Amino acid sequence: MASQGTKRSYEQMETGGDRQNATEIRASVGRMVGGIGRFYIQMCTELKLSDYEGRLIQNSITIERMVLSAFDERRNRYLEEHPSAGKDPKKTGGPIYRRRNGKWVRELILYDKEEIRRIWRQANNGEDATAGLTHLMIWHSNLNDATYQRTRALVRTGMDPRMCSLMQGSTLPRRSGAAGAAVKGVGTMVMELIRMIKRGINDRNFWRGENGRRTRIAYERMCNILKGKFQTAAQRAMMDQVRESRNPGNAEIEDLIFLARSALILRGSVAHKSCLPACVYGLAVASGYDFEREGYSLVGIDPFRLLQNSQVFSLIRPNENPAHKSQLVWMACHSAAFEDLRVSSFIRGTRVVPRGQLSTRGVQIASNENMETMDSSTLELRSKYWAIRTRSGGNTNQQRASAGQISVQPTFSVQRNLPFERATIMAAFTGNTEGRTSDMRTEIIRMMESARPEDVSFQGRGVFELSDEKATNPIVPSFDMSNEGSYFFGDNAEEYDN
C-alpha cells in the first residue's frame, strides 16, 4: 500500500509504540500479554479458584469483562451521573463457576472497580496498560464474530445480510483505539458512518455548535480509517467525496452502501490478530514463561505454539457437541470467522464446518440457565500447521483489486483462489451510476467485472510445520474448488444482542 511508510505495524498499534524494530516490537507485545497473564493469576488467587476453575474459559471471560468495565471511563462517569436502581457504579462483577461435589455451581461475585484497577496496574508495572485492555476487547470481538450473526444490524442500516463477511469487529467498543480500528471490517466502518449520518438527518443540532465540531472531526476520522482500508484509487476517491460532504445525508449513505458492496470483490485490507483468552497467558506465566524476554507476536507462530500446550476447559450444555464448541473457540482465537473454511480446515488439521452445522451455542452462559445439567470438557485448540496472519484483503495482481468471494475476508496468508459468484454480486449494482460519484462508480464496476474467480491470491504463500518457527519451508496447499468456502452458509446462529 502506498502509505506503508507512515503506517505503524499492528504490534506498534497494539502497544501504543512509535516506530520500533522487530525485536522491540516483540518485546513490547510480550510485555503486554505477560501483564495480562500476571493479572489473571492474581485474580485467580483473589477468587481462590482451583487450577481447573482457572482454566475454565467462562471464568476467564468474566474476569476479562470485569477489568474492561473497571477501566471504562465514559461508562463509569455516566453511571455516576445517572444512578440506576440496583447498579453500584463503583462495583463490577459477574458469574464465577466453581466445581462443588461433582457439580458446577454459579457464584455471582462483586468487586470494587478501584480494587480491580489496582490489581491490573500492579500486574503491568504500575501502568494503565491500555494496550492489554484493547487486546482483551479484540479477543471478545473475535469471539462474537465467530458466534453471532449481525443480520439484523445490517438490515437496520440498509445493508444486505449477505455482506456479513465485511462485519469483522462490529461489536468492538468505540474506545478500542488504533489497534481496534485496524481489525474492523469495511462493513463495520460503513455501518458506524451510516448510523452517524442518520443521527445527523434526524437531529438538526448533531453537526452544530461545539459538540458538532467534535462530531465532525470524529466523522472525518472514521472516513479516513475506512479510506485506508480500500486498495483502489476509485474507492478511495469516493471516500474523499463522502468525507468532504458539507452536510452528509442520503447521498452519502448510498455511496457508502455502494462501497460496502464493492468490497465483496475489491476487498479492503483488514488486520487479523490472534488474541487469546486471559487464562491462556496466565497458564504460560504461571509455568515460568517470560513473555517479555522471549518476545511475542500476534501474527506469527507464537499464538499457535501457546495453544499447542495450553489446556483450556469450557462448560458444555446438555445437547452441545464439545468438538463444535472447540471449533468456535479455535476460530475466535485466530480471528478466523471470515476465513475460507478450506484454508482453516487445512491449518487446523480437522474439518471446520459452517456455522449452520454447529451444534453449539455461544460460550457464555446466561444467568437463567440451569447449572444442574452443565458439564465441562477440554477445548481442542491445537493446530496441525501455522500460517502468517494477513492484513490485506488478498486481492491478486500487485495487491490491486481482483477476485473476491461473497463471504470471505482472508485471515491467513496462504495461497488459494477466491471462489465467488460474480453474477450474484453484480446484480446488486444495476442502475444508479449517476450523481457526483458516477465516474468512480463506473470505474469500480468495471474493475469488478474484470475480476476472475480463478485468479490466485497470496501467490506462493503457504502454511508451515509447527517445528518451522522461522517460516523457512512453506507448504502450499491445493484446494478442492467445488467446496464452498464460507462459514456463514445455511446460517442459523443467534443474533448478537448487547
Swiss-Prot record:
Gene: NP
Post-translational modification: Late in virus-infected cells, may be cleaved from a 56-kDa protein to a 53-kDa protein by a cellular caspase. This cleavage might be a marker for the onset of apoptosis in infected cells or have a specific function in virus host interaction.
GO cellular component: helical viral capsid; host cell; host cell nucleus; ribonucleoprotein complex; viral nucleocapsid
Task of the protein: Encapsidates the negative strand viral RNA, protecting it from nucleases. The encapsidated genomic RNA is termed the ribonucleoprotein (RNP) and serves as template for transcription and replication. The RNP needs to be localized in the host nucleus to start an infectious cycle, but is too large to diffuse through the nuclear pore complex. NP comprises at least 2 nuclear localization signals that are responsible for the active RNP import into the nucleus through cellular importin alpha/beta pathway.
Record note on quaternary structure: Homomultimerizes to form the nucleocapsid. May bind host exportin-1/XPO1. Binds to viral genomic RNA. Protein-RNA contacts are mediated by a combination of electrostatic interactions between positively charged residues and the phosphate backbone and planar interactions between aromatic side chains and bases.
The keyword RNA-binding appears for this protein: yes
Predominant location category: virion
Region (Disordered): 1-21
Keywords in alphabetical order: Capsid protein, Helical capsid protein, Host nucleus, Host-virus interaction, Ribonucleoprotein, RNA-binding, Viral nucleoprotein, Viral penetration into host nucleus, Virion, Virus entry into host cell
Upper classification of the organism: Viruses, Riboviria, Orthornavirae, Negarnaviricota, Polyploviricotina
Protein name: Nucleoprotein
Family designation: Belongs to the influenza viruses nucleoprotein family.
Residues spanned by motif Unconventional nuclear localization signal: 1-18
Statement: the UniProt record of this protein carries the keyword Cytoplasm: no
UniProt-annotated location(s): Virion; Host nucleus
GO biological process, one term: viral penetration into host nucleus
Motif (Bipartite nuclear localization signal): 198-216
Any one GO molecular-function label of the UniProt entry: structural molecule activity
Cited InterPro entries: Flu_NP
